[in-house]
Curated annotation (Swiss-Prot):
<feature type="transit peptide" description="Mitochondrion">
    <location>
        <begin position="1"/>
        <end position="29"/>
    </location>
</feature>
<dbReference type="Pfam" id="PF07147">
    <property type="entry name" value="PDCD9"/>
</dbReference>
<keyword id="KW-0689">Ribosomal protein</keyword>
<comment type="subunit">
    <text>Component of the mitochondrial ribosome large subunit (39S) which comprises a 16S rRNA and about 50 distinct proteins.</text>
</comment>
<keyword id="KW-0809">Transit peptide</keyword>
<dbReference type="GO" id="GO:0003735">
    <property type="term" value="F:structural constituent of ribosome"/>
</dbReference>
<dbReference type="GO" id="GO:0005743">
    <property type="term" value="C:mitochondrial inner membrane"/>
</dbReference>
<protein>
    <recommendedName>
        <fullName>Large ribosomal subunit protein mL37</fullName>
    </recommendedName>
</protein>
<comment type="similarity">
    <text>Belongs to the mitochondrion-specific ribosomal protein mL37 family.</text>
</comment>
<dbReference type="GO" id="GO:0005762">
    <property type="term" value="C:mitochondrial large ribosomal subunit"/>
</dbReference>
<dbReference type="GO" id="GO:0005739">
    <property type="term" value="C:mitochondrion"/>
</dbReference>
<dbReference type="GO" id="GO:0006412">
    <property type="term" value="P:translation"/>
</dbReference>
<keyword id="KW-0687">Ribonucleoprotein</keyword>
<dbReference type="InterPro" id="IPR052482">
    <property type="entry name" value="mtLSU_mL37"/>
</dbReference>
<dbReference type="InterPro" id="IPR010793">
    <property type="entry name" value="Ribosomal_mL37/mL65"/>
</dbReference>
<keyword id="KW-0496">Mitochondrion</keyword>
Length: 423
């Protein structure tokens, strides 16, 4: 009989026999299998120079390299003579040249007003009128202002943006939304031969607006870029008559107590109160005509609700009108002899919002007196849905590729706003 080795004898001597739950593998501790501890090793002690009063430490600073037995020298922080932007330390806010003790509530392009249009009307001291003005609707209904093969060309614009422009099977909203608006503007420009005064306009992109006003005791500012902006050499004519403007004195603005009217606005102590239209002095197209605001976020959570988009349109149109009025009539709050009119179009590529704002007064501090006017036409569908891929059931094409539920009246209003002031 062969003699068993030492480990084998120890295993056989155990009452439970072979290990690993009786499978013949001996049990060992965790460290016997080579498993290391997950505890991090202690950091090495810091090399420091112990200062003893009356004694000077001997370091290897003069040697210019490490020497065992000598203390590690302590050098002062290195000053390269310039500051890297990554490591620049900003001064305290109170030392900023534009710092002010009075807080300013700023509305920028990503602000979402909690109360929507109702809050925007209070901030701008404006009276809301549903629907577009009769003057604009008459331009939309007049067949002389229509484009040749208008409906067919608009359908081609929609198909170009949703189907032909992108190589993706289903283009994203951020891709097709700007293409639709740009193509519709180009389609409106084709009327220059019929209306030569349309050549006195230009479309600018990403201009920065900044204007500030007092609303009661609150300082409010609109700051940022609204997207594409149509500017003209000549201002838009007033919409409401003098009698209609005087009648706004009796209008009472709706409040939303106990909610603060400045909710959703950004509080800031660093701001500039000077007005800036986004264009230099002497710009040949100084008058704002129409703002085109796009809501092209792909994720639904990042999109503006329709009411929030209309509120954004009101504030940016009001900011452009106020900056233009102060440029023409000065900074003193007063009732304007010639009201300033600014239009706005907002869309997500499918649903359009139309707006016309008339600035009647720059006296915005009190609730009394003349109010501004805004006409809003909400939720106008250009088309119901667009099938990027055909729907096939039982080898039969149920839904072909293309738009469904096309509504030509929406583009007529779009065209009427573009032609307003030139016809």
């Amino acid at each position: 009989m062969a003699l068993a080795s030492g480990p084998a004898r120890r295993v056989l001597a155990r009452p439970w026999g072979l290990g690993l739950e009786g499978c013949g593998v001996p049990r060992r501790g965790a460290y016997e299998w080579g498993v290391r501890s997950t505890r991090k090793p202690e950091p090495p002690p810091l090399d420091r120079v112990y200062e003893i009063p009356g004694l000077e430490p001997i370091t290897f600073a003069g040697k210019m390299h490490f020497m065992p037995g000598l203390a590690r020298p302590v050098f002062p922080p290195w000053d390269p003579g310039w500051t890297h932007p990554k490591f620049r330390r900003l001064p305290p806010l109170q030392e900023h040249p534009l710092y002010k003790d009075e807080v300013c509530y700023i509305f920028h392009q990503r602000c979402r007003l909690l109360e929507g249009v109702k809050q925007a009307l209070w901030l701008t001291k404006t009276k809301l009128i549903e629907g577009l003005p009769e003057k604009v609707l008459s331009l939309a209904d007049n067949p002389r202002n229509h484009i040749e093969n208008q409906d067919e060309r608009v359908l081609n614009v929609i198909s170009h943006a949703r189907l032909w422009h992108s190589t993706e099977d289903i283009p994203k909203r951020e891709t097709y939304c700007p293409v639709i608006v740009d193509s519709l503007i180009q389609l409106c420009k084709s009327q220059i031969l019929k209306h030569p005064s349309l050549a006195r306009r230009i479309c600018a992109q990403k201009n920065m607006l900044s204007t500030t006003w007092k609303r009661e005791s609150t300082l409010i500012q609109v700051h940022g870029s609204s997207g594409a902006q149509l500017n003209a050499k000549d201002p838009l004519p007033p919409i409401a008559s003098r009698e209609e403007v005087e009648a706004t004195k009796n209008h009472v603005l709706e409040t939303f107590s106990p909610i603060s009217p400045t909710i959703s606005l950004q509080e800031c102590h660093i701001y500039d109160v000077n007005d800036d239209t986004g264009f230099r002095e002497g710009y040949p197209y100084p008058c704002p005509h129409t703002l085109y605001l796009l809501e092209s976020a792909n994720l639904r959570a990042h999109r503006f609700q329709p009411d929030q988009l209309r509120a954004k349109m009101i504030l940016f149109a009001f900011g452009n009108a106020l900056a233009q009025a102060r440029l023409l009539y000065g900074n003193d709050p007063k009732v304007l002899e010639q009201p300033v009119v600014v239009q706005s179009v907002g869309t997500d590529g499918r649903v359009f919002q139309f707006l016309v704002l008339q600035l009647n007064t720059t006296d915005l501090a009190s609730e009394e007196g003349i109010k501004n006017l805004v006409w809003v036409d909400s939720d106008q569908l250009l088309y119901q849905h667009f099938w990027c891929l055909p729907v096939i059931k039982k080898k039969v094409v149920v839904e072909p590729v293309g738009p469904t539920g096309f509504q030509p009246e929406t583009f007529r209003k779009f065209l009427a706003l573009y032609l307003h002031g030139a016809v």
